[in-house]
Amino acid sequence: MGKSLLRKTKDGKILHWNVEIDDSLCTLQEAFQQVDPNVGFNVELKFDDHIVYEQDYLIRVIQAILKIVFEFAENRPIIFSTFQPDAALLIRKLQSTYPVFFLTNGGTEIFYDVRRNSLEEAVKVCLEGGLQGIVSEVKGVFRNPGAVTKIKESKLSLLTYGRLNNVAEAVYMQHLMGIDGVIVDLVQEITEAVYDMIKPAKVVEKEDNKSLNGEGEDGEVKTKPQFSQRELSFLLKLIPELIQH
């Protein structure tokens, strides 16, 4: 039998995690040892949103994680990410092997630490600490699409997460905006749907000329959304208004 699992509710209560089959959580070391080494890891460092952490504590936690990473990661692709600004800066300061991304709600939720409250502040954190990029809640990007250009001009990568990323059209719009990647739940479904939107349109014609002169079955035409620069600019102005409601 594995150890009993506990879960923490949003109001801070600790409850037993009741499931059909109980098992213990694997350690980071076990994940490195048992998962295909070709599978990349996003090692997210999670901290309590409402605690102000001392730097010594953050250093101890991060050094313990880095010890496991450097011992067992081998050639596995890895990025680090965290919502905690000081932790993000320390991860980068303590190692330069793996990219570090700063997670942000992009202003969709307000925190005591102002560095967490906007994409503009996220850029400042990244530039201050030499981080590689930002991972934003997708609504934060749609509410402030102008920030994408500023982020790219700062030579930072931009990824997004959030429920809207399970909508193919929302992901396709981000492709048009120049966003570098998305975190999704429905990986295969979204990948296939967006691929169909991105790939060039195809016309399937009959070998004979019946489809050309109107006789017989018409050729099948697969289309993708087409936007002029003016239309795209209009959509980018409209999206923030839609997201507010």
Describe each PLM feature range.
Residues 1-111, 121, 129-142, 154, ...:
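Metal-dependent phosphodiesterase/phospholipase catalytic core, i.e.
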Residues 101-245:
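C-terminal active-site rim and adjoining tail of enzyme catalytic domains
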